[in-house]
A protein has these predicted regions:
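Extracytosolic ligand-binding ectodomains
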Residues: 2-31, 35-432
């Protein structure tokens, strides 16, 4: 296994050169660590001329040996409480003889950013408690290699594992890990946890189902007697996936609601209420369908007897709605995994610290790495590794980028159900 202990290098120069330098430094450290000899305990040679036939002495030696073995096991377990393995796809094995190139930088950027944020999180915790021993492993984005890592001594001696991050890696690693009680933190994959079937998996990124349930909760909260909820179904995959279970989830949050489902704009128009607010829920990301919906609702909303509020898919955050000048009047709301408030002092301090340390500004992955380190490190400090499972669902967290609120399923482990909300204001979706 190629791995590197917790080392950092100061970056300098332009952004590409800075990342190239760090990749080069990490690759050197990985190589050194992989080739470093293992140290052992030196023992004195036995004295063949000294023989004891005393049963009492033999029994005493056996007791001492058992006590030493028990103490060694206890020390190993105690040390593992502070050991964290971080598995990220640096893919340093792809670097050619000519050295680090631009493609190498791009390929490793996600891993580097997460690693650097994670490191700053551990540094923050070290100010108030004992430091953690971080073992960084290049997972190489290779399923077979991940299956071999899972059975390594480094993993066995770790309290928790953060990573791998890609679905194919997670499956290979999780299925090969001998200790099914050891938590695997999936920090970035958005795939539903049900795809992996690992009850020791902790999925950080909210799934699309979590977004569905989150929006349903918001719609139910906004609903008052006299309103009507209209679920607008379209044929695109994103819409079908997002709206699957929406009606049931809304009713689970508020039983006595007036709610209908439609599949055409004419049906939608026929069911618009002129007395209460029309809470229209759409999951489409098809541009034609979305443009037609917005144009239709904007026209209806301009009529003084209609009041419309629109709820949509989280991917709407990536779209440009500037061609719909009255889009804001629909008061659109979407869910988001991000809780990043760039204007807060905490976020600004992290941003400045990151820039001073690495010479570049943090990316979303950097913030996510920081949150994962602070949350799980804090819980280990508070409860110990052995008690993490029993306390994850009891400990919500509001970080720089993410919020955490975990639910547990005995088939696929812990899933983060926390989402935030954005409303369209001044030309973009903004956190509320």
């Amino acid at each position: 296994m190629t791995s590197v202990q917790n080392h950092q290098q100061q970056l300098s120069g332009n952004n590409k050169l800075k990342k190239s330098y760090l990749i080069y430094a990490v690759s050197l450290l990985l190589g050194v660590s992989a080739c470093a000899p293992k140290s052992g305990v030196l023992r004195a040679p036995s004295n063949p001329g000294q023989v004891s036939t005393s049963a009492a002495e033999e029994a005493k030696k056996a007791e001492e040996k058992a006590a030493e073995k028990e103490a060694a096991a206890r020390d190993k377990k105690d040390a593992a409480q502070r050991n964290i393995s971080l598995l990220l796809p640096f893919q340093l094995d792809h670097i050619g003889a000519e050295g680090v190139q631009e493609n190498d930088v791009k390929r490793s950027a996600l891993a580097l950013d997460f690693y650097q944020g994670f490191q700053l999180g551990l540094n923050e915790l070290a100010k108030k408690s004992d430091s953690f021993n971080l073992k960084v492993v290049d997972s190489k984005d290779n399923a077979y290699y991940n299956s071999t890592i899972a059975t390594s001594e480094d993993i066995s001696n770790s309290g928790i594992i953060v990573g791998p991050i890609y679905p194919i890696e997670i499956k290979a690693f999780g299925n090969s890990l001998p200790d099914k009680e050891k938590l695997i933190i999936s920090p970035l994959a958005a795939s539903p946890a049900s795809e992996f079937g690992l009850n020791n998996l902790v999925t950080i990124t909210p799934s699309i189902t979590s977004h569905t349930n989150g929006l349903a909760k918001r719609v139910a909260k906004d609903y008052i007697t006299g309103d009507i909820i209209i679920i607008y179904n379209t044929s695109d995959n994103d819409s079908r996936q997002f709206l699957n279970g929406m009606l049931a989830s809304i009713k689970e949050n508020k039983e006595n609601v007036k709610i209908i489902s439609v599949s055409t704009l004419s049906q939608l128009n026929e069911n618009l209420s002129t007395t209460g607010t029309n809470l229209v829920v759409s999951g489409t990301t098809d541009k034609t369908q979305l443009n037609n919906l917005i144009s239709n609702l904007s026209k209806k909303n301009s009529e003084e007897y209609n009041s419309i509020k629109l709820y949509g898919h989280p991917l709407w955050d990536r779209f440009d709605f500037s061609n719909h000048t009255n889009f804001y009047s629909l008061r659109p709301v979407i869910t988001t995994e991000s809780n990043l408030k760039s204007w807060t002092s905490t976020t600004r301090n992290f941003r400045d610290t990151y820039k001073a340390k690495f010479g570049i500004y943090p990316s979303d992955q950097s913030y996510k790495g920081y949150d994962v380190a602070v949350y799980f490190g804090s819980l280990i400090n508070k409860y110990g590794v052995d008690n993490l499972r029993s306390n994850l669902t009891k400990e919500p967290y509001t970080g720089l980028f993410n919020t955490y609120k975990f639910d547990y399923n005995e088939k696929w482990g812990f899933t983060n159900e926390a989402v935030s909300y954005k409303e369209y204001l001044n030309g973009s979706f903004q956190l509320q």
